[in-house]
């Protein structure tokens, strides 16, 4: 039975404004709902076996379902079904006092928003009642379509499936005294990264077990049965045990079904009320056991097996998302909301428990809401090499600084799936040691090392960027050709950083072993196209690809990167010895301005070469010699920080929470790139040259990477891509002719 909003409004708490349906009464409320199960001054229920704790956990689960469905239906948009199938598990964790809850499933967003509303976190966004919750759901500057860095109390920027585990593991590493549960959908369990990344992490950090995957095993993915829907309970338990989990805690709703529902997956909201309480008690006990196990040093997983869409408008994959007809007037929506309706008194009780749990609103108590204190780095010990002196390996020069950072900051880690030795940065391993349970001096291995080297780009990128998001310094290193497998999680995190409510150390990466250094390895190792992705991301506002031309400039690039916040800084450099072209002072100016002239000569007409990269400078300098012999003026400009070369209106910098609005002005641009002809040169993606090509008014052209091939030398590979002095001279003469 329900009462209309108008009839009930006088007796309703203010926060209930906007709730469409209320129950007239609830079974057993007078017996188990007299006072909040989480007492005043406490942060959790005292005993998960107490009947009032179980009863109020059930109320909380239904409150989450109701809000999830009502806010999604208010926009006929969003995903209620997945979260609904694990509402009891989420409610149980909150009642047990755990507020640092993360998700691997972006589609669980409306459920998480509902939880943040109930514990009053969303008041920091001006959302104080359900009507405002409805109004601002899936709206700009409101409750974004998927979880992000913008919402108080939640730091789970769930991008593509297979990412949320990184945030939980990162937070667990930094905060050993707290539990970090994270929900995982069984549809997403098909992603290879979820379990493998946890296995890698557990090998490296066997004592860090205070993260808790909560598998939402509901039998369905987005549009069909999940690929693990045919597994038995025993098979699922064996799966997790086979992947190193010591404790597997599973609750199957089917074991409590008294309505003879068909199939292996059932809806607990269809049970009799007594059986609903039994099921909720089992989930609460399981959550308590799993939490204690994870905090006690065992790698643990909690599994709740319940039909997708339990308690909402549809069941199975049909409950995954709403369609245009699923408005608040839709019969299925109305029936589900009326069935899940609570009394005003029950709403007040749920809200009180959620607010008290964990010591207050997640927006005030979650570890992600505060700035992590960082160690002082002191002097980095930069070493300036003489311009024109002996060629040096840029990555090795940077590696020395990285070692110093790690020695000063024990939370700092370096990750690299390809191996630091192969990237010219063996000195990082020597200084910081590879994390491995087997000590071995030959390989610089030590269980307490700071270099994380599983052979998985996702695991490496995920831990590095996850720790940065949580407030710690890191460095992700990779071969340029293989970094693509870690790029999705990096993009997710840097996008979250752009809207994060606090400053945090920038994501810093080092990509090396570029295409020109991989001739013998062939095209499988020659994939500079990743630069096109970062070129596009430069317009986001907080992405800064940098291309130091030598061993001096790479040191100043890293020095600068360490001072920044909420950015994604991608350092791309060769691992081969190359000429020293810039002083430290010049290098720092290049970072500030975006580029710097390496060579300039006069002539009747001037050709400007705008060069992105280090090794590709060689044919450009050779071309300059030929052009100068023909009395053509030549200027060679090294493009070090192309993001600075855009116009302010090209980039969404002013929408970033830590805005960086420094751009080279028109006079500075003309001073660097003004001439009779302009040729952009890169051994990577031509998109990196876009800022220059947009602003130049000269006759211009671009030389860029085309495709890979097996070759005996960098020069041969450049020739295959048209990057030769002969071609550059020919085109220059055509442009000025």
Feature names for model-found ranges:
Residues 2-78, 122-158, 351-372, 380-387:
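Conserved internal helical-beta-strand scaffold that buttresses enzyme catalytic cores
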Residues 57-60, 101, 352-505, 587-596, ...:
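Non-catalytic terminal/interface segments that mediate subunit docking, oligomerization
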Residues 49-53, 69-77, 98-99, 150-156, ...:
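Glycine- and acidic
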Residues 49, 57, 64-69, 74, ...:
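Cofactor-binding active-site loop characterized by glycine-rich and histidine/acidic residues
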Residues 133-212, 281-285, 420-533, ...:
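Thiamine diphosphate
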Residues 86, 112, 166-168, 233, ...:
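Short, highly selective alpha-helical patches that border small-molecule cofactor pockets
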């Amino acid at each position: 039975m329900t009462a209309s909003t108008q009839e009930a409004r006088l007796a309703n708490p203010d926060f209930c404004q906007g709730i469409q349906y209320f129950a007239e009464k609830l079974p057993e409320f007078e017996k188990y709902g007299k006072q909040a199960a989480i007492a005043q001054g406490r942060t959790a229920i005292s005993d998960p076996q107490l009947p009032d704790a179980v009863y109020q956990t059930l109320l909380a689960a239904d409150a989450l379902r109701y809000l999830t469905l009502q806010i999604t239906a208010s926009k006929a948009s969003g995903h209620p079904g997945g979260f609904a199938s694990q509402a009891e598990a989420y409610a149980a964790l909150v009642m047990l006092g755990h507020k640092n809850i993360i998700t691997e499933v972006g589609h669980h967003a409306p459920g998480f928003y509902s939880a943040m509303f109930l514990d009053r976190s969303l008041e920091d966004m001006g959302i104080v009642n359900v009507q405002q919750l409805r109004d601002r759901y899936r709206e700009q500057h409101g409750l974004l379509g998927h979880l992000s860095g913008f919402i108080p109390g939640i730091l789970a920027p769930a991008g593509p499936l297979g990412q949320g585990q990184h945030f939980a593991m990162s937070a667990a590493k930094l905060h050993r005294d707290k539990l970090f549960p994270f929900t995982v959908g069984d549809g997403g369990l098909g992603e290879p990264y979820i379990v493998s990344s946890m296995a890698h992490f557990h090998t490296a950090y066997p004592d860090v077990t205070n993260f808790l995957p909560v598998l939402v095993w509901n039998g369905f993915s987005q549009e069909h049965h999940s690929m693990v829907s045919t597994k038995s309970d025993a098979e699922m338990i064996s799966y997790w045990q086979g992947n190193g989990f010591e404790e597997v805690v599973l609750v199957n709703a089917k074991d409590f079904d008294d309505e003879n529902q068909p199939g292996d997956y059932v809806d607990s909201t269809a049970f009799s009320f007594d059986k609903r309480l039994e099921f909720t008690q089992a989930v609460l006990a399981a959550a308590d056991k799993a939490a204690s196990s994870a905090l006690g040093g065992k790698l643990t997983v909690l599994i709740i097996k319940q039909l997708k869409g339990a308690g909402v408008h549809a069941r199975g994959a049909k409950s995954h998302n709403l369609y245009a007809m699923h408005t608040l007037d839709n019969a299925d929506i109305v029936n589900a909301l009326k069935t899940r309706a609570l009394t005003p008194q029950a709403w007040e009780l749920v809200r009180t428990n959620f607010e008290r749990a964990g010591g207050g609103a997640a927006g005030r108590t979650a570890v992600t809401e505060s700035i992590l204190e960082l160690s002082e780095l002191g002097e980095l010990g930069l070493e300036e090499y003489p311009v024109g002196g002996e060629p040096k390996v840029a990555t090795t020069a940077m590696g020395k600084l990285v070692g110093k950072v790690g020695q000063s900051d024990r939370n700092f880690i370096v990750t690299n799936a390809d191996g630091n030795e192969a990237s010219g940065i063996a000195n990082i391993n020597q200084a910081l040691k590879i994390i491995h349970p087997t000590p071995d001096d030959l390989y610089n291995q030590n269980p307490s090392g700071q270099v994380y080297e599983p052979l998985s780009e996702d695991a490496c990128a995920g831990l590095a960027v996850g720790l940065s998001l949580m407030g710690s310094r890191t460095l992700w290193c990779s071969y340029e050709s293989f970094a693509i497998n870690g790029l999705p999680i990096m993009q997710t995190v840097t996008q979250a950083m752009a809207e994060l409510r606090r400053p945090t150390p920038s994501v810093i990466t080092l990509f090396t072993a570029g295409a020109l250094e991989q001739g013998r390895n062939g095209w499988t190792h020659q994939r500079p196209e990743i630069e096109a992705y970062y070129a596009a991301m430069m317009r986001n506002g907080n992405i800064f690809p940098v291309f130091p031309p030598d061993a001096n400039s790479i040191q100043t690039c890293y020095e600068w990167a360490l001072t920044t916040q909420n950015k994604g800084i991608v350092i791309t450099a060769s691992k081969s010895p190359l000429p020293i072209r810039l002083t430290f002072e010049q290098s720092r100016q290049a970072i500030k301005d975006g580029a710097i002239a390496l060579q300039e000569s006069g002539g009747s007409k001037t050709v400007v070469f705008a060069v992105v990269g280090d090794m590709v400078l060689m044919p450009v300098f050779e071309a300059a010699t030929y052009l100068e012999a023909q009395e053509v003026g030549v200027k060679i400009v090294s493009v070090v920080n192309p993001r600075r070369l855009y116009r302010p209106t090209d980039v969404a910098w002013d929408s970033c929470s830590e805005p960086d609005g420094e751009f080279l002005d028109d006079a500075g641009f003309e001073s660097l790139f003004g001439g009779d002809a302009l040729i952009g040169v890169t051994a990577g993606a031509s998109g990196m040259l876009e800022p220059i090509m947009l602003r130049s008014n000269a006759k211009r052209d671009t030389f860029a990477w085309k495709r890979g091939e097996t070759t005996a030398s960098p020069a041969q590979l450049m020739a295959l891509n048209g990057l030769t002095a002969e071609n550059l001279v020919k085109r220059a003469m055509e442009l000025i002719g």
